[in-house]
Design a protein with these regions (language model features):
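Active-site donor-nucleotide binding/catalytic segment of nucleotide-sugar enzymes
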Residues: 9, 14-29, 120-122, 175-195
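Hydrophobic/aromatic beta-strand patches that form the interior of the parallel beta-sheet core
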Residues: 49, 91, 112-113, 135-137, ...
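Short, charged/polar "capping" segments at the starts of alpha-helices
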Residues: 29-32, 55-62, 99-100, 144-148, ...
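N-terminal pre-catalytic "stem/leader" segment of glycosyltransferase-like enzymes
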Residues: 1-85
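Extended catalytic core of nucleotide-activated donor transferases of GT-like folds
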Residues: 34, 58-129
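A nucleotide-sugar donor-handling region in carbohydrate enzymes
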Residues: 1-4, 132-195
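Structural motif
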Residues: 19, 23-28, 51-55, 88-89, 92-95, 110, 115, 135, ...
Length: 195
């Protein structure tokens, strides 16, 4: 029932709330997407619709006038949601879009992959794990170099690659520096490990 209700709720979301959609497989993804949402909501004053498959994701109760959250648990309705999704931009930390059960929408959507792993794109993941994305927010130049090489080798269309960094790691490093300077009480919640 929860999946159907979530799917139905998303279908009722107004178009201006579907300009930027962020999909999270679990609440643990928040470590990687929080900084992006903060910039979108606070700095750029952009509405964000957050879709999670985690029924216990604390962001389902987050209150902000530019943030809305919907839960669509894994299963038939999540697959249907991905297949028929209407959105301008969808940001995910989930690799293998279009390779496994979750496919790109039949509607025009710009898909952005937000890396959560620091490692190589071809040493651990499937060779085509990132092929379905239109843009990728890369951790650093190594991702850009590897993805460009794959585009060249596979005669793929050139995608938008950005050296975005790794907000979770940067937050932890910032917290460590603050701790060393005796400022541990000034660290943000983003730097606090989950309990």
């Amino acid at each position: 029932l929860q999946a159907w209700l979530g799917w139905r709720s998303y279908r009722k979301v107004a178009a201006d709330w579907r300009k930027i959609v962020i999909y999270s497989e679990s609440g643990q993804d928040w470590h990687y997407i929080e900084a992006l949402i903060e910039v979108l909501n606070h700095d750029l004053q952009q509405k964000v619709t957050y879709v999670t498959s985690d029924q216990n994701d604390p962001r389902l109760s987050r209150r902000h006038h530019l943030f809305g959250a919907i839960c669509i648990p894994e299963g038939f309705f999540l697959t249907l949601h991905f297949n028929m999704q209407k959105a301008d931009v969808v940001v995910l930390t989930m690799m293998d879009l279009d390779n496994l059960q979750l496919k790109k929408s039949i509607n025009p959507v710009h898909y952005i992959y937000l890396f959560h792993a620091l490692g190589s794109t071809h040493m651990v993941d499937h060779a085509n794990s990132y092929d379905a994305y239109d843009s990728l927010f890369c951790v650093g130049p190594h991702h850009v170099e590897e993805l460009r090489k794959r585009e060249s080798m596979q005669a793929m269309q050139t995608r938008n690659l950005f050296e975005y960094g790794h907000p979770r790691l940067e937050s932890l490093l910032s917290a460590a520096r603050a701790y060393e300077q005796g400022l541990e009480h000034e660290t943000s919640d983003a730097a606090t490990p989950p309990v």
